[in-house]
Amino acid sequence: MYPDGLCKLDDHTWSKCIEFEDVNYQLAKPDDQTAIFEALCDMYNAHDASIGMQLSLVSRRMNREDFVKRIEIAAQGDHFDHIRELYTQMLRKQLERGNNGLIKTKYLTLTIEARDSKTARARFSRIVMDALNHFKVMGALAKELGGKEWLEMLHGILHPDGERFAFEWSWLAPSGLSVQDFIAPSSFRFGEARKFTMADKFCAVSFLQISAPEMDDRMLTELLDTDSGLLVSLHIRSMDQNEAIKTVKRKITDIDSMKIDAQKKAVREGFDMDIIPTDLATYAGEAKNILRDLQSRNERMFLMTFLVVNFSDSKQKLENDLLRAASVAQKYNCSLVRLDFQQEDGFVSALPLGVNRIKIQRGLTTSAVAVFVPFTTQKIFHGGEALYYGLNATSGNMILADRKKLKTPNGMILGTPGSGKSFSAKRSIVGVFLNTKDDILICDPEAEYFPLVNRLEGQVIKISPTSTQYVNPMDINLNYSEDDNPLALKSDFILSFCELAAGGRNGLEPVEKTVIDRAVRIVYRPYIADPRPENMPLLEDLYDEIKRQPEPEAQRIAAALELYVHGSLNVFNHRTNVDINNRIVCFDIKELGKQLKSLGMLVIQDQVWNRVSQNRDQGKSTWYFVDEFHLLLRGEVGSWSVEIWKRFRKWGGIPTGITQNIKDLLSSPEIENIFENSDFVYLLNQASGDRKILCERLNISNQQAAHISNAGPGEGLIFFGNVILPFADDFPKDNELYSIMTTKLGETGKGENEHE
């Protein structure tokens, strides 16, 4: 093995290995499945008889310590260590429910003959690049393995329980050891005919005997769906096209000869000469079909060896695993046959090295080989600040996603009432709080979030006509805009505010907008000159300044604003008197009346923008969760929401809209921009009308749509950039966090005032 990933198998044989990731094949639309299948055919056809291919699919356990380390949240000696422990308990329990730490990896090993390493490298540079391009067409991320990565992969197969791999190239010369010494298990024993042991594992190698007239693309997926270690290897080598055609023609000639003999025998015995053995007629038809495929349908002939290695903890478990694998093969009219007295050769041949010592080969055309599609479903398992979003409903893999990796991290949580929208948002809030240092802001129209916010020692701001908690809509920080004039954007907000307060049916007239803009610039002069809190203007200052303007329109605006300054709706004419800088701030607007609801939501949007612009200079992200998001999509509030959705990404803002009203989301081209500017969509159960709209908008296949039809709470589809995964999140009800986050009657309230 060379450091650059070139492997020397013998004096003239060399190999290279490519690791490729999964794509969403099983749940894709039929057209997309066909495109992947055709791309796979093209890749096989691109390799001539001088290139050996080995497709290896590995299912093994990840190192338990490493796996747990990626999901555990370390204690920090503060009030929230108990919550960290509860959250980690939940993640551990979900891990046990899922695939229990099994990871599935996929490799393509390419083998050529060359006289020396220089010649091999030169030839592999083109071959590997072509293969990577073919995977790109399929939508699969792929990379060429370096020598150390390849050794680590082999070490993982030879140590199925996930022992740690330790190796450096600089260790070889001083130690006198070879690379084999660093990857080999403690022992092998090949003394038995039908199985062998590798360290403390009981193993068996079988080959697939293909007797089905047609294969199914689900067979590999079902074969790999196991809770034990498994290695599936397909050795594939193309035949020379002319030689393949000659071989098939010879077979047809042989069959015709046998047919003539059978006819002669029938005539001698007094039977009709057209009555020939059924098998002969079948073989003749199949051979002619193969010849036609080779000559006119862009098919090639391949020789394939299909090997399966089972790894188990006990003899009984091995027998059970073998029976399960055999039943899968039987389901598709194939047989899984043990390699008697060839266990060692079979195991060496199954390892992703490009070596094939098993001479049991089956001739198949390109389409027949490509039907063994190595793809099932993608995975999202990020490290660092990734949040938990459930378990992959297809593979059982835990979904850990970091939205900051997306081009546009804006998100939507969509679902019918009772599908788990608010619960999913609260689970995300806890994840953000524990996994990051980011700030969290919540717009809460139904007063659902205060138990969680109180538990996390956040600030709940109750905005209502009778509340004594105030937020000043005139608050501004000098970083409010990305240019040097923060007043331009603030003036735009105040115009929207006045539009709602004084605009009437037809909105503000141009002259009225001019008056307001002039007054805004005047009232902010003292604060811009000396930015102290006591110099921050109030709505009353704006009202007084507008009254001083000479235009007649100014008096009309002032008269309309009087209700919000000196009248009964003067909740927004006070200085901010709450901790707006707490890490978690929840704006409770449930008791805002109809007159103030839109104004209240607009003021919250502005406060959020203040916080986002302030945090940007500190290099901190700001998460903004908006429940009942459809309420923010109308009129001036809607325009401001669209503006925020566009601007947030550049400023480190990560907004999440939560709603069941899909039709409101798509009510106008402007509002549609919010949907199109969201690379994260968390789809829970959908009503039939909304489901139809979403399937068209998001290009959802029928198989995927099944996961949002009559789905249980916490089940659906997650859209993460270009990745679509079905998920299920059955949050443990015995976890204390559940009672803080649920909105179900009878299950809420427990622990909401507890503090450590």
Regions found by a protein language model. Name each.
Residues 424:
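Hydrophobic positions on the alpha1 helix immediately C-terminal to the Walker A/P-loop
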Residues 413:
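Hydrophobic anchor at the beta1->P-loop junction of P-loop NTPases
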Residues 421:
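Conserved lysine of the Walker
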Residues 431-441:
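Post-Walker A helix-loop "phosphate-sensing" segment adjacent to the P-loop in P-loop NTPases
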Residues 1-377:
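Extended, folded cores of ATP/NTP-driven motor/assembly subunits in large transport
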Residues 457-461, 670-683:
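A short helix-turn-beta junction within AAA+ P-loop NTPase domains corresponding to the substrate/partner-engaging
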Residues 23, 30-49, 60, 224, ...:
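P-loop NTPase motor domains
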Residues 698-754:
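Conserved P-loop NTPase
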